[in-house]
Amino acid sequence: MHSVLNGIVFVIEFMTGFLWGDLLKIPLPGGSTLGLSPMVLLLIPAGIYYTLCTKFLPIRMFREMISVLIEKPDAKMQGDLSKGKLSGIQTLIVSTATRVGMGNLVGVVAAISGGGAGAVFWMWITALIGSSTAFIEATLAQLHKRKDPLYGGFRGGPAYYIHDFFFHNKPGEKLEEGIPKKRSIVAALFALSGLICWAGISQVIGNSVSSAFENAFSVKPLISSILLVLIAAVIVLRKNATARVLDVIVPVMAGLYFAMTVFVILTHLPALPHVFERIFSEAFGLRQIVSGGFAAVLMNGVKRGLFSNEAGSGSAPCAAAAADTDHPVKMGLFQAIGVFIDTIILCSCTAFIMLLTPEGMIKDLQGMDILQMAMNYHFGAFGKIFIAVILWLFSFSTFLGILFYARSNVSYLFGDNWASQTAYKIFALVMLFVGGLAQYTVVWDLGDVGIGLMTIFNLLVMYPLSKEALSSLREFEEKRKKLNG
């Protein structure tokens, strides 16, 4: 048995290294090399391709994104969370819950620590091209969604548009269909990869929360883990409670964090030009190229952007498909601006808090300690408590969001039944509890493997299906032109 477990661990570590390690190394001036992982080699070209296909949609249609965000939907499209019906803004909140997590805090700190201030610029660029990928996959999820007999409303995501691709189903053709009797192997592999990934993330979330509360309030991990699981269980084991809770806490937590950052910026306005000068000069600086540091600057920013906004991984489309909307493109625009909110706004909040802190105070620190010291500098003892609470909210909302994603994939694999839905929720709660007591690296690696495989299966089908989303985009723009005269 021991040798079998060792073999499984070896396979997981090998796959993690292959998917996220350096597959291609490009020599650079200064003796350094630019290492490119398979994930970067897949996601960056995909983002550039879809940005060109949509004629630079993130820039060209930014006004349209804001418009769909603030417009009041028709009475039929407003959503009824008690019946499982979500409006466009509610699906954006669910997807934002999973995008906005520990990565917006510690991940950004790690990017700047490893690549300097210039990493922030490349994080922004990655978000811009990632918005186009997010638009395509969310629009496809709407085009191929199904009615959900369990929760009410709709369900869908990559498992369903992958299924339709291999069974040659047209958009909307199977709207009334339940779970098909014949499954697509690729779609099933995507769904399974997602469930593996989200279970692994649950364990990491538990560890993050217990560590933060132990540091801030001296609460023992066992106590914080029990409380976290009990609160989560009350929500996730109730029908349609997840979206209702996220509808409340996500705007609050994001608003609080943004407000704190605005306060930091306003109290350090004279230093702001220097921060921007650092970001742009270190992104393109000759010193970085000559010293061999350009690769670190570029890749830390790119990876941070990719990991944070999830564009291309196929996660967010599981929420986008649940929306009741009068046009599929609107959900694509919602998810495109979701990438903007996550990376350009919230990841930048962490970057500014860190870059407006004297370098000498955080020079020898790592990870969460850097951010806690930065917050302590700006807000005193309150800053440490605030970060612990915000991390709890970010992590907890991520857990609720991934369980929302999981339900459509569980249904695809195991059919429409409450037994499989409840079993996966209990499994995720167990992982959450175990993670609060100890972090097992192999489980985190398993999550990395899961999201890597999700991305491969998703992008594999997105390329041939993207013409459907682009056709829908053209039809949407023509309709808008006629309405606007």
Question: Where are these predicted regions, by residue range?
Answer:
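Alpha-helical membrane segments and immediately flanking helix-loop junctions
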Residues: 77-113, 140-143, 150-166, 170, ...
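Extracellular/periplasmic helix-exit of transmembrane alpha-helices
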Residues: 137-149, 262-278, 286, 292, ...
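Membrane-interface loop-to-helix entry segments
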Residues: 42, 46, 50-66, 186, ...
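Extracellular loop-to-transmembrane helix junctions
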Residues: 32-68, 113-153, 341-347, 448-461
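Flexible loop linkers connecting adjacent transmembrane helices
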Residues: 57-86, 107-110, 116-120, 134-180, ...
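Helix-loop-helix module between adjacent transmembrane segments
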Residues: 50-51, 96, 126-154, 163-235, ...
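N-terminal alpha-helical transmembrane segments of multi-pass membrane transport
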Residues: 1-102, 112-119, 461-485
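Transmembrane helix-loop junctions in multi-pass membrane proteins
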Residues: 53-58, 104-108, 197-210, 232-245, ...
